[in-house]
Amino acid sequence: MAKPSPTHSGSKQLIALGKAIRELRLESEFSQEALANEIGIDRSYMGGIERGEHNVAIMNLTKIAKTLKIKTSELLAAAGL
């Protein structure tokens, strides 16, 4: 019988990334809903990203960084990754 795949929700890295995204979003004066709309995702999903509940696709990370006017590498560095 196949083992269920492990969940990444709540991992230290995802929590750190979510915290960095939230801090950068607030510094840029975006609401959660406005940032979510800019990158084409639901606000509730954006909230999950910020809480470290979702393993974010690289394309969404790139869109988030671009919208916040930073490089993706800077976003990852802000999270300590």
Q: How should these model regions be labeled?
A:
Residues 40-54:
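Recognition helix of helix-turn-helix/homeodomain-like DNA-binding domains
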